[in-house]
């Protein structure tokens, strides 16, 4: 092998191992914001519900304060709430829940959103939490809707639905006709294949995280371009760690989601958050969702699907205004 080829192989190897760094730098802004990380919790552990699903939870903040329960989105974990945790932890009791097959929760037994909502009701009973404010992002918002309209209807003070649709997720996103046409012949079989072959997809996910290819997709799927490189790598790393069979199972669960007939049953204050640059949940769908909620309000932000991280400083103030509104403090 010639010296030139050796240098090419070395360059390829370096790119495969560290490509995420230059790609994240090129795809991100230079804004000076605090890097996301892991904050210590006051207590943590696992709880198992009657469905057979086991959840990892972390609690933070003063334990006698108003509780806010955080439910993350698909292929994320409770770690996505870093900025919200730092902002709200001094004043509120915070509960961070990893969905089964995400973060530190083991694979789920049943990932239907109705089951996850019943599980949430059981978790609130186990933790002796009364009248929480439930804050759901994306998939977490779907569970929040099911909870507030059903098993948690008598044990919820308010809800926050951030970038979360009220019906089949492909109906409230970009290219709905194409995605719906591909769902049964392509996407569902693909997800079933991923569940059966997790080793291959875990390897693929790890390689794509290291070389930065997943950085590219996450930049356009989750952010508007004002995220920092550390934020982009942080979220991509969370996704790379999650078990692919768990993500596939959860994805199949939300493909059967529909709360359009139930949202009128939600009788508590609800803040619906949408974003101008969110390809996953269109702001127009948020307008309809708010119109169906008896106490709904709409906050539209100039951000992407992960505005809770990309523009956390501004968003946390807006969410805090809702949490401290007279409807929730009387």
PLM regions with names:
Residues 130-175:
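Conserved hydrolase catalytic core segment
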Residues 266, 272-274:
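Short beta-strand/loop motif that positions the catalytic acidic residue
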Residues 58-106, 123:
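Conserved HGGG/HGGXW glycine-rich cap/lid loop of the alpha/beta-hydrolase fold
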């Amino acid at each position: 092998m010639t010296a030139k080829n050796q240098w090419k192989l070395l360059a390829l190897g370096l790119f495969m191992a560290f490509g995420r760094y230059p790609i994240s730098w090129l795809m991100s802004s230079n804004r000076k914001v605090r890097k996301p990380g892991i904050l210590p919790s006051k207590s943590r552990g696992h709880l198992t519900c009657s469905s057979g699903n086991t959840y990892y939870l972390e609690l933070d903040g003063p334990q006698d304060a108003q509780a806010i329960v955080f439910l993350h989105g698909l292929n994320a974990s409770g770690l996505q709430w870093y900025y919200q945790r730092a902002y709200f932890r001094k004043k509120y009791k915070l509960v961070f829940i990893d969905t089964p097959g995400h973060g530190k929760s083991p694979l789920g037994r049943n990932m239907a959103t109705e089951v996850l909502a019943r599980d949430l009701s059981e978790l609130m009973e186990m933790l002796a939490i009364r009248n929480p404010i439930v804050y759901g992002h994306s998939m977490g918002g779907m569970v929040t809707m099911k909870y507030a309209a059903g098993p948690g209807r008598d044990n919820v003070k308010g809800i926050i639905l951030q970038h979360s649709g009220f019906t089949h997720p492909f109906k409230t996103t970009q290219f709905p006709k194409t995605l719906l046409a591909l769902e049964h012949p392509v996407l569902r079989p693909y997800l079933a294949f991923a569940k059966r072959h997790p080793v291959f997809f875990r390897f693929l996910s790890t390689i794509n995280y290291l070389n930065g290819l997943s950085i590219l997709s996450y930049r356009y799927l989750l952010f508007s371009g004002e995220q920092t490189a550390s934020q982009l790598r942080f979220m991509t790393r969370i996704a790379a760690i999650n078990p692919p069979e768990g993500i596939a199972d959860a994805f199949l669960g939300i493909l059967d989601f529909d709360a359009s007939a139930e949202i009128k049953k939600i009788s508590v204050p609800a803040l619906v958050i949408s974003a101008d640059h969110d390809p996953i949940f269109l702001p127009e769908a948020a307008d309809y969702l708010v119109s169906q909620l008896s106490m709904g309000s709409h906050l539209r932000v100039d951000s992407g699907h992960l505005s809770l991280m990309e523009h956390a400083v501004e968003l946390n103030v807006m969410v805090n205004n809702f949490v401290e509104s007279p409807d929730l403090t009387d």
